[in-house]
Design a protein with these regions (language model features):
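NAD(P)-binding Rossmann-fold cofactor-contacting core
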Residues: 172-198
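Conserved S-adenosyl-L-methionine
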Residues: 169-174, 273-275
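Adenosine-phosphate binding glycine-rich loop
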Residues: 252-253, 257-312
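Glycine-rich adenosine-cofactor-binding loop
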Residues: 38, 129, 148-169
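Short helix-loop-beta connector
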Residues: 144-149, 250
């Protein structure tokens, strides 16, 4: 009927008005800009995640993704100051490239020489690395503390290095790192020395991942087994660094940084053996939450809401 159609039109106009009002509230002459620096970035869910949080907490901020060429990284970092941005996240392949342009680095970022979050503190650019914090925060959300624990870590690339330094800083008793003995081995040895300097009480050891006997012994000895390499994600979703599931035991905690698939072969087999497991999606969300806490000076990201909105 005409009355019914008019009611629908009125509702649409009202909704459009609310949307326009919401847009005016989000963007103004005082809106503070934040962003993502990397390449490629079109696939990133960071803008949706952070802008959701800004709306939720009525923050006059906006977050955009910037696809930056390698020769534009320095200019992009300088723009954070020039445009009075609150900060920026940094993704591949520029986590190490931005380091020389920071005014200050946190201990974790300094140790591994990699930055994934830049915070503009009144014109001083502070480089953080929240990957390691995301890992330990995800464990904490699952009732697990790393202090005093013996940890076996498989993979010591960018994410693995972040995890290694963070668990050492948070008081892990022992950390056994396994990595392929490839061209990156010398740089891993340097990282181990850097970690020892900032966390001398953590007993560190480095092993070739090809040494299955050493890996078996480490898994038998440790409290937490963490996978931090690409094994488990496509096209290796049917693979695991632990070839023999009999190595698992019910009192072992098994974690994986891979978040797609949400449950890797490693985690499936560990869970079947009675282990407590933690997947990579929680770490991904927690490292973003740590960055939001830094940007917002202490606000807590609604992690469960973000997961339901973007990943479920």
């Amino acid at each position: 009927t005409a009355a019914f159609n008019q009611t629908i039109r009125n509702k649409k106009f009202a909704a459009a008005g609310r949307q326009e009002e919401e847009t005016r509230m989000q963007l103004s002459g005082t809106t503070t800009l934040l962003g993502l620096i990397g390449s490629p970035v079109a696939h990133s869910k960071s803008p949706a995640m952070y802008n959701y949080c800004f709306r939720k907490f009525n923050m006059d901020c906006a977050y955009l993704a910037f696809d930056v060429a390698a020769d534009q990284v320095e200019q992009s970092v300088k723009a954070i100051k020039t445009l009075h941005m609150r900060g920026a996240n940094v993704t591949m392949p520029f986590k190490t490239t931005v380091v020389p342009y920071m005014d200050r680095l946190t201990p974790a970022a300094e140790t591994i020489q990699a930055v994934n979050t830049i915070v503009n503190e009144d014109g001083v650019l502070v480089g953080h690395n929240t990957d390691g914090c995301g890992y330990t925060q995800n464990l904490r959300r699952n009732g697990i503390e790393v202090a005093g624990k013996k940890i076996t870590l498989i993979g010591c690339g960018g994410v693995g290095s972040s995890i290694a330094v963070q668990v050492a800083l948070e008081g892990a008793a022992e950390l056994a790192i396994f990595n392929l003995k490839d061209k990156f081995w010398p740089s891993i040895e340097e990282r181990m020395e850097a970690i020892h300097k900032v966390a001398p009480n953590c007993v560190l050891s480095l092993h070739d991942l090809a040494d299955q006997d050493a890996l078996h012994a480490a898994v038998d000895h440790c409290d937490i087994l963490s996978n931090a390499n690409m094994v488990g994600m496509p096209p290796m979703e049917n693979m695991s660094n632990i070839k023999d599931p009999s190595w698992f035991r019910p009192d072992l905690i098994v974690t994986d940084v891979v978040y797609s698939p949400t449950e890797t072969k490693l985690l499936r087999e560990a869970k079947a053996a009675g282990c407590k497991t933690c997947g990579g999606l929680g770490m991904l969300l927690c490292q973003g939450a740590e960055a939001f806490r830094l940007y917002s000076k202490g606000l807590e990201m609604p992690i469960d809401e973000i997961q339901a909105l973007l990943y479920d």
